[in-house]
Structure formats: C-alpha cells, structure tokens
Regions:
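N-terminal, positively charged/glycine-rich alpha-helical extensions of SAM-dependent methyltransferases
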Residues: 1-22
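Conserved short-loop catalytic and cofactor-binding motifs
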Residues: 2, 26-30, 122
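Soluble or luminal CAZymes and related metallo-dependent hydrolases
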Residues: 6, 34-38, 130
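Conserved acidic
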Residues: 7-8, 27-30, 59, 79
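A short secondary-structure junction motif
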Residues: 21-24, 49
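Conserved SAM-binding loop and adjacent beta-strand
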Residues: 23-42
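Conserved SAM-binding loop
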Residues: 39-46, 51-153
C-alpha cells in the first residue's frame, strides 16, 4: 500500500486522540461544535437521502455518522487505523452501516473512480504533504455532476 502522501507524525498525532474522538468536551470538541454547520452546508446543496458519499480524512467518523444518520450511504476513509477502529465501533454501537476504510484518497480514486455522488474532505488538506493530490483524487472519485466539499484552515 502506497502511503506517499501521508505524514507519520500526523497519523501518530490523531492516533493518540483516538479514544477521545467521541468526547464532545475533549480535545476534538471543536469538530463536534462545527459538525451541525458542516452538515447543514452540505445538505443545503444536495439531498443526502440515499446519496453515496465518501468522507475523506474521516478520523473517528463524526461527520461520516451525521451523513449516515441523514440517510446517505456513507464511506469513511482515513489512514489512522486507531481512529478508523473507533469510528467502526461507534457506528456499531449506534446501529449504523458505514463502510470505513484504512486507505488514502489516491488509493480509493484508483480503485473506484467516479463512484460517489459526493465527496467531503473537511480539515484534512492541511495534514498531508501534497494537498493537490488529494483534491485531484476527490475530483476523480465523484460521479459526473456530483459535488466535492472541502473545508480547511485559512
């Protein structure tokens, strides 16, 4: 598995917080606070019901679960295995069917081009050495006429 667009220190940083992804008052609380705004922004552009959506850089699945709860067929992608494990367990606890994968946007785009109605990539681009590669891969993942949603630090 190629991980050329991954920084080990970034993976380690998020792996250290893996057990705290779902602590709404913990170190990742800002993600919980902005999640309703994110979801409303996405929902304002597409009807989430039955849409096939990939959440690139999903971490512990905060946005991914919100998308699934809104009716989307959600896939969460991240390279932090500990975060993906937390996301999988939380989805099971909440009776949600979400396809979580330990892979990169680039690898998913090579394996499944033009296979999603929408892509989300929130606060992830600042954590990779080559953001343009992720953007290109997200564009390759979305079906013609689909949507790609990005958010990153200014």
């Amino acid at each position: 598995m190629s991980t050329t667009n991954v920084t080990a220190s970034e993976i380690d940083k998020f792996s250290q917080h893996a057990s705290q992804w779902w602590d709404e008052l913990g170190p990742l609380k800002t993600l919980h606070q902005v999640n309703p705004v994110r979801l409303a922004w996405i929902d304002g552009h597409i009807d989430l019901q039955s849409q096939k959506i990939a959440d690139i850089g999903c971490g512990g699945g905060i946005l991914t679960e919100a998308l699934a709860n809104a009716g989307a067929q959600a896939t969460g992608v991240d390279m932090a295995a500990d975060s993906i494990e937390v996301a999988r367990m939380h989805a099971i606890e909440n009776n949600l069917v979400i396809d979580y994968q330990i892979t990169t946007a680039e690898q998913l785009a090579a394996a499944a081009p033009a296979s999603f109605d929408a892509i989300t990539c929130m606060e992830m681009l600042e954590h990779v050495p080559d953001p343009a590669s992720v953007i290109k891969s997200c564009a390759a993942l979305v079906k013609p006429g689909g949507y790609v949603f990005f958010s990153t630090l200014n």
